[in-house]
Swiss-Prot record:
Classification via PROSITE patterns: AA_TRNA_LIGASE_II
Residues at which L-aspartate binds: 172, 218, 449, 490
SUPFAM superfamilies per record: Class II aaRS and biotin synthetases, GAD domain-like, Nucleic acid-binding proteins
One Gene Ontology cellular component: cytoplasm
A Gene Ontology BP annotation from the UniProt entry: aspartyl-tRNA aminoacylation
Annotated segments matching region Aspartate: 196-199
Name this polypeptide is given: Aspartate--tRNA ligase
Catalytic reaction list: tRNA(Asp) + L-aspartate + ATP = L-aspartyl-tRNA(Asp) + AMP + diphosphate
Record family assignment: Belongs to the class-II aminoacyl-tRNA synthetase family. Type 1 subfamily.
Organism: Actinobacillus succinogenes (strain ATCC 55618 / DSM 22257 / CCUG 43843 / 130Z)
Subcellular location: Cytoplasm
Record keywords: Aminoacyl-tRNA synthetase, ATP-binding, Cytoplasm, Ligase, Nucleotide-binding, Protein biosynthesis
Role of this protein: Catalyzes the attachment of L-aspartate to tRNA(Asp) in a two-step reaction: L-aspartate is first activated by ATP to form Asp-AMP and then transferred to the acceptor end of tRNA(Asp).
Any one GO MF annotation of this record: ATP binding
Length: 589
């Protein structure tokens, strides 16, 4: 037997038992007549004592070094009272080693477990990085999450059905990873950005509750919380309304938090997209932050200050304000830093007003813009914001999108900088009623979610007549400012689907070429259906308390979409390229 117990699972209940442990030397201490090691496996660390009573084991232990892979046979004993370590799960016991075997020695590590290593080092030697207890714990938590999800879905009648990895390229927002076909030269498969169309086809096939924990691929510019390959908890249902789908998924996430963290998320509030953007400047608001954004365009329409008056009188403009309680102590240097910060989001400036005495009107404020405001305007702004003595007001005035994005970002930064965001809380919510379409950079309409999302209470004729007025029957789940999942009611009427395609500039020939199989399937008694998908990586980030998505993936890519350990991507050999009829064209610098 190589192992009878895990190191990290030993406790007082094992005292007196003979055990066989297998794992790694985490740390070694030579105290002259005694040698102690901390021995580690995936479940944790236990202290092992080598005593002269078992001289052969003690002699062999003298040659041990960190990360040797070893086996210990010995007896679990109680630690003396003055040696109990309450910071270790196994801190009340130790193992008296009677026999030691070395499976494998270790070279000097290129990583130092006791210090910060660069992320490049950690990714290059990922198999060593994953030995660290905190990394092992994150992957164990990820496994617990998927195990819980599978049990929940099975208990609620969902079928785990796999969908193809080699499929057809369809426009879903990001670039596809393409796979050349050897058999069909010149043609390519695409790796799926999501199983969206296949899961809808499964609903048309009669499998009314589907789920899958599935890899997805997007060839897009990466951010800190994005990976080229990522994992979704993918869900689709037939004959359920949007509120019914949300209720099931909310129960799953509530159960997940209770199971992993022992935290009760309570009932999730529901907020419209418009309310989220207006009050919080974001479609994924962090409700742990108490600051809110108020609109004051109606108050400042006629002031002699073009910075306010122009956007206030523009149908596409916005003048908004954030009140920071007790913020009057913020220095001019800090205000300048915040002004620079909102510039990142396109804002041309940041007006401010300190409330030294809320009852003194203009006499009680300090601000470069005070000269443009009357007593009546000041009072109206105070009433709108519930301003109090000692507060500071920050104003954003610009085109609606710029002002909203800038003030939303400023709200988050102020919450962090001033310690206002309650970091010990969980604040989930649903955001619903998104616009059906948004304008892209060229001014063309694009689907805010994807082109298979159904509008709310719109006929095809109404949608074609006024597409920008349509509200999508879509919903996102947000927790602490992170969008953890999103979905929608799907289009199940072929006429509506073709209407949406036309609005998006996809003509009939392109519709047949790209989506002919879907349009055909919609003709044969398609049921009403709805679904959503959760980002497993992001859920795991939240549940393990890390802000780096690479911490919760066993073998992640860098922000340049490279694997430093295997050195992927790599060049293909010439024979393989010839079989695929591919010629590599290199551009000169």
């Amino acid at each position: 037997m190589m192992r009878s117990h895990y190191c990290g699972a030993l406790n007082r209940g094992n005292i007196g038992q003979e055990v066989t442990l297998s794992g790694w030397v985490h740390r070694r201490r030579d105290l002259g007549g005694l040698i102690f090691i901390d021995m580690r496996d995936r479940e944790g660390i236990v202290q092992v004592c080598f005593d002269p009573k078992y001289q052969e084991a003690l002699t062999a232990a003298a040659d041990l070094r960190n990360e040797f892979c070893i086996q210990i046979k010995g007896e679990v004993t109680a630690r003396p009272g003055n040696q109990i370590n309450k910071n270790m799960a196994t801190g009340e016991v130790e193992v008296l080693a009677k026999a030691l075997s070395v499976y494998n020695a270790s070279d000097v590590l290129p990583l130092d477990f006791n210090q910060n290593n660069t992320e490049e080092q950690r990714l290059k030697y990922r198999y060593l990085d994953l030995r660290r207890p905190e990394m092992a714990q994150r992957l164990k938590t990820r496994a617990k999450i998927t195990s819980f999800v599978r049990r929940f879905m099975d208990d609620h009648g969902f079928l785990d059905i796999e969908t193809p990895m080699l499929t057809k390229a369809t426009p879903e927002g990001a670039r596809d990873y393409l796979v050349p076909s050897r058999v069909h030269k010149g043609k390519f498969y695409a790796l799926p950005q999501s199983p969206q169309l296949f899961k809808q086809l499964l609903m048309m096939s009669g499998f009314d509750r589907y789920y899958q924990i599935v890899k997805c691929f997007r060839d897009e510019d990466l951010r800190a919380d994005r990976q080229p390959e990522f994992t979704q908890i993918d869900v689709e249902t037939s004959f359920l309304t949007a509120p019914e789908v949300r209720a099931i998924m909310e129960n799953m996430i509530r159960g997940l938090w209770l199971n992993i963290l022992g935290a009760d998320l309570g009932k999730f509030p529901i907020m419209t997209w418009n309310e989220a953007m207006t009050r919080f400047g974001s479609d994924k608001p962090d409700l742990r932050n108490p600051l809110e954004i108020a609109d004051v365009a109606d108050i400042v329409k006629d002031v002699d200050f073009k910075v306010f008056a122009d956007p206030a009188n523009d149908a596409n403009g916005r003048v908004s304000v954030i009140r920071v309680p007790n913020g009057a102590s913020i220095t001019r240097k800090q205000i300048d830093e915040y002004t620079q910060f909102v510039g990142i989001y396109g804002a041309k400036g940041l007006a401010w007003l300190k409330v030294n005495d809320v009852n003194a009107g203009l006499e009680g404020v300090q601000s470069p813009i005070a000269k443009f405001l009357s007593e009546e305007k000041i009072k109206a702004i105070f009433d709108r914001t519930s301003a109090q003595t000692g507060d500071i007001l920050f104003f954003g005035a610009d085109k609606w999108q710029i002002a909203t994005d800038a003030m939303g970002a400023l709200r988050l930064k102020l919450g962090r900088d001033l310690g206002l965001t309650r970091l010990d809380e969980w604040q989930p919510l649903w955001v619903i009623d998104f616009p059906m379409f948004e304008c892209d950079e060229e001014g063309n309409l694009a689907a805010m979610h994807h082109p298979f999302t159904s509008p709310k209470d719109f006929s095809p004729e109404q949608l074609e007549a006024d597409p920008t007025a349509a509200v999508a029957n879509a919903y996102d789940m947000v927790i602490n400012g992170y969008e953890v999942g999103g979905g929608s009611v799907r289009i199940f009427d072929p006429k509506m689907q073709q209407t949406v395609f036309r609005i998006l500039g996809i003509d009939e020939q392109q519709q047949r070429e790209k989506f002919g199989f879907l349009l055909d399937a919609l003709k044969f008694g398609t049921p009403p259906h709805a679904g959503l998908a959760f980002g497993l990586d992001r859920l795991t980030m939240l549940l393990t308390g890390t802000d780096n998505i690479r911490d919760v993936i066993a073998f992640p890519k860098t922000t340049a979409a490279a694997c430093l350990m295997t050195e992927a991507p790599s060049f293909a050999n010439q024979q393989a390229l010839e079989e695929l009829a591919i010629t590599v064209v290199t551009k000169e610098e």
